[in-house]
Amino acid sequence: MAERANLVFHNKVIDGTAIKRLISRLIDHFGMAYTSHILDQVKALGFQQATATSISLGIDDLLTIPSKGWLVQDAEQQSLILEKHHHFGNVHAVEKLRQSIEIWYATSEYLRQEMNPNFRMTDPFNPVHIMSFSGARGNASQVHQLVGMRGLMSDPQGQMIDLPIQSNLREGLSLTEYIISCYGARKGVVDTAVLTSDAGYLTRRLVEVVQHIVVRRTDCGTTRGISVSPQKRTLPERIFIQTLIGRVLADDIYMGPRCIAIRNQDIGLGLVDRFRAFRTQPISIRTPFTCRSTSWICRLCYGRSPTHGDLVELGEAVGIIAGQSIGEPGTQLTLRTFHTGGVFTGGTAEHVRAPFNGKIKFNEDLVHPTRTRHGHPAFLCYRDLYVIIESEDIIHKVTIPPKSFLLVQNDQYVESEQVIAEIRAGTYTLNLKERVRKHIYSDSEGEMHWSTDVYHSPEYTYSNVHLLPKTSHLWILSGGSYKFSVVPFSLHKDQDQINIHYLSAERRYISRFSVNNDQVRHNLFSSDFSDEKEERIYDYSELNRIIGTGHCDFIYSAILHENADLLAKRRRNRFIIPFQLIQDQEKELMLHSHSGISMEIPINGIFRRKGILAFFDDPRYRRKSSGITKYGTLGAHSIVKREDVIEYRGVKKVKPKYQMKVDRFFFIPEEVHILSESSSIMVRNNSIIGVDTPITLNTRSQVGGLVRVERKKKRIELKIFSGNIYFPGERDKISRHSGILIPPGTGKTNSKESKKLKNWIYVQRITPTKKKYFVLVRPVTPYEIPDGLNLATLFPQDPFQEKDNMQLRAVNYILYGNGKPTRRISDTSIQLVRTCLVLSWDQDNKSSFAEEVCASFVEVRTNGLIRDFLRIDLVKSHIFYIRKRNDPSGSELISDNRSDRTNKNPFYSIYSNARIQQSFSQNHGTIHTLLNRNKESQSLIILSASNCFRMGPFNDVKYHNVIKQSIKKDPLIPIKNLLGPLGTAPKIANFYSSFYPLITHNQTSVAKYFELDNLKQAFQVLNYYLIAENGRIYNFDPCRNIFLNAVNLNWYFPHHHYNYCEETSTIISLGQFICENVCIAKSGPRLKSGQVFIVQADSIVIRSAKPYLATPGATVHGHYGETLYEGDTLVTFIYEKSRSGDITQGLPKVEQVLEVRSIDSISMNLEKRIEGWNECITRILGIPWGFVIGAELTIVQSRLSLVNKIQKVYRSQGVQIHNRHIEIIVRQITSKVLVSEDGMSNVFLPGELIGLLRAERTGRALEEAICYRAVLLGITRASLNTQSFISEASFQETARVLAKAALRGRIDWLKGLKENVVLGGMIPAGTGFKGLVHRSRQHNNILLETKKKNFFGGEMRDIFFHHRELFDSCFSNNLHDTSGRSFIGIEFNDS
């Protein structure tokens, strides 16, 4: 009884963790047997009390937290404000997503924290409360889902779904919430079916890698270890203790002169407490990494057995235990309910709050303006910043650490408890982050603008990928667009009044022209959209005006001037103009039926400089027979050397060499028959035959002469050469005359008579056998080429003279190269010469015209006749049309910046939409011509009243660069406006003349600031659009065949009695961008966002636009001024997000690490870290042997990194796995090296995978250095690269493994467990271990001097041992110097 009296009575609630602690203390104190006896009594007590209480769970026990309603309401309010900010362009999509997730995460966490106090106050004996908070059943997360809110879910890929589940399971879920819940929850099909098997397969692979690792020795004698430092607080206390307990020391631990622990002592709780108390130097512990046994492990490197707390027994199969320990939590945790831990929080940020109301003061030079990750403006401080908060009687000082955000401005008044700064937590950098790309898509179509300079990203210099250097807005100026199959053409002058309904979707876009006195007079109209299918044409005769050619150059045939009938054979890209001219000198040409000028334009519409515009086949140069074309004479070398007309991508181009004068050429006729191999030939090679000799059964020769038969591939070519045969006397005389042309008037060289030739002849040497040869003299038809038909006269000269110095000139060229055989196919004739019309234009430096133009045929209907015009635009860029094969209506655009876009609605299907819009407004508009700054091209804009919004009238508005007089004339013209909101609109054109050039200054404005500042002019002008009042803008920029839909312009008239929001008057300048809700006049309407289009004395017109915010480093797609369509990618943000902490996302990540698949973040971090290490080492030790140690350190470093990554995933789930299990696995993955050179050729092959220790030992035995490279094998590859082929074959690819093993004659020593199980032997583990293994002699511990100033703090000292020979040979003198000095220690934190 006396003993009982001394016991202390603890009156406390004991929960799961307390019981764990109690049990471990009991085991330490009383041992196993007694502890189990105590625990039996505790169990009996527990059951007895539970029965007496009759505890049970009912649905009424789930009490909802009362504060939930207003918390959720508050979060919704915040989300709404956030949505607005995003709409105004203050935050971008990524920031919005981040902030909304954090808002809901915080709400959910508040609710969770409320839960425990709520239960304690309202119902302390609630069964749910008792069970979950004691740890008996369920955890806080699960109860929170039952009575709080389910919160945010993540989808199976680990991305957060930003719509939170606000209900809890007690209230029941709505349909949407239920679907999200199924998508993200752990009970889905995905998890039960797929992930369980994944976890099982992971376990199988893990066990496969390490099944042969058994404890087979007490001590391997290593002197290496991994150092863990108690001083550095990089590790949480709990993990530090967990790392140390159960390990064995690799080195003596000194405290001053006193040794407090010796080498090979195992670490218990008492020793850890002593280490923590003394704050000793780094502690070096032994790990499986440092064990020197090749294929097993020793007791001391493994440490205590987790089951009974003593050193591990010999024969323990620790490999299989390790594999199971890592795989097992996976199978358990896949089916867990969802856990929202730490997603997107990016390290919990601590807030600094103001203690009382007052003014803030700090040094502004030490801070730098930036944006927080939520898009709020803030200041970033680089070093410690002192912030002073002053009120009337108190002064409070706060120190804010570096890298923190200051959320207030200098001299700002703050209220009590207001957040003034956000401090990044220390754990921030340790988080596993992955880089995610987020694409932002345009949700409207229109024209793109930037409000800042944009850099080309270096790897895509010539593409449309740009990098933003600073935070700025991208604007999409509104306006729809239509794509056209033909190039739209239109001829308008400035200030024209027009009314056109230009887009006629069903019919071709045909306008009517009448040609009078060489002036083109237009009646502009088109058919109205009515339900009737016939063509109804309205003629607005009062709109007739003489309109000169604007940007387009028309080249039209002179025939049009004479109003002669024009019959054009129409193809899509080519037509032929028949000759009907009655000039005498050309009459003979016209007799031939086939003659005619062909004009052809490449299918893509691109016409190159000096390209062929039209060609004419002269009938005088046609031949009916095959033959060979030759140029020039023997004396005059042929000028054109086998150059053909080069056709590439459908573009005909004449090379400059062609335009040299070939005054005459020669045609050598020959008869050619092409026969199949099987046909029987009735004549012999080199025989001479007469006319009409049968050659095969059904063909006869048309000329007589020498027969030559050649076999080519799968056919036989039989040629008949007409001409005379001579047998020359001496061989060398004739050799140089084989295959030459001899002009008339020369003597024959190969006969004794000197006869003069009358005609040209062609001499060719023929060798039927080796000794015999003879000469064949063949007749030749010479052709003279005159200057040719002057095609240029067909085209009037004026369009070329006026502009751009375009020239047409006729060029004759020969279709066949010198000495090239021409083949006649069936009954066609061969055209030898073609006369071409070459179009070129001057390329002087001032007008920077490209090498290419856009050309197209335009069909014009005049008085019932259809005329064809050729339209040529000199442009810089172009768009190709590619017709899809099966779909005639859809076409794709590929512009020259390589961005592909598919036109979703083909041309013919827009009829129904267009008709509805067409019926809306019929009013007049005004054309205005915009001039580009470098005067390359003009463009038109037509504006009308119904599509602008207007602000005004203002009295005090200041304008930039605007002449007041031009504003004061404000003639209002009446406009017939059927459905527009207003009856009047100012005559827009007047103001354009003075303001329009200003639009090129790219100004922007920032919401909330009333001073709207000018930005510097950065870019080219607006693009050129033609706006029709019926709701479309026609893009008149000739480089794109795209018509833009109407710009939404709105007119605003505020009331006259108004006051300004600020005393300073708002400055509005033309072309400036205004964000939504910028207040210009107090009583005026709230503006929509847009670009100021027109400024007048009392009002402004704004073209509506949508801003998108982009932060530095974002990638902008598309060019400035480019037309974008809905759904096009606009910007790509790259941002870092914390890995989702859920184990189901965790398992694939564990597997990625173990299988060494490269994920961006892992490979980046590891490689960078290793590079950094190698640099450090060489800096510390000097180059030569820094590399040797660098290799060792690389392996050690990557091993530690892998262990930490795997631990991280499990710890985030509250799963405790001892490091040594993971270390055993990682050791197997990293223990192989790749033999790189043939330095070891007598032992290993290059490219062979061998164990690291084996390579080192072989190197020492052979006394030569080995070249090898450390490799990370994945667990699958490691399982297939073991010493036992039976184990490999039973894992995967059985046939391949066995076949290889047979070829190599491998021997399996049956050292592992699996081989023995397969063959039915006794496994070498446990009791079977002693019988099988003969003790190999224990290695004597290598005695190395371990002084206090040891090398690398006990980390790498045995490098000397491994590479002693290498060191001795190279550095025998250096070592003596270095041994005396102390080296800088390098430590690996086992964190």
Swiss-Prot record:
Keyword Chloroplast: yes
InterPro entries per record: DNA-dir_RpoC2_beta_pp, RNA_pol_beta''_euk, RNA_pol_Rpb1_3_sf, RNA_pol_Rpb1_4, RNA_pol_Rpb1_5, Rpb1_funnel_sf
Catalytic activity, EC: 2.7.7.6
Protein localization: Plastid, Chloroplast
Binding of Zn(2+), residues: C220, C291, C298, C301
Gene Ontology CC, one term: chloroplast
Catalytic activity as recorded in UniProt: RNA(n) + a ribonucleoside 5'-triphosphate = RNA(n+1) + diphosphate
Keyword Iron-sulfur attached: no
Cofactor note text: Binds 1 Zn(2+) ion per subunit.
Cofactor(s) required for function per UniProt: Zn(2+)
Matching SUPFAM superfamilies: beta and beta-prime subunits of DNA dependent RNA-polymerase
One MF annotation (Gene Ontology) recorded for this entry: zinc ion binding
CDD domains, alphabetized: RNAP_beta'_C (cd02655)
One Pfam family in the UniProt entry: RNA_pol_Rpb1_4
Family stated for the protein in its record: Belongs to the RNA polymerase beta' chain family. RpoC2 subfamily.
NCBIfam families: rpoC2_cyan
Name of the molecule in the record: DNA-directed RNA polymerase subunit beta''
Organism: Gossypium barbadense
Gene name of the encoded protein: rpoC2
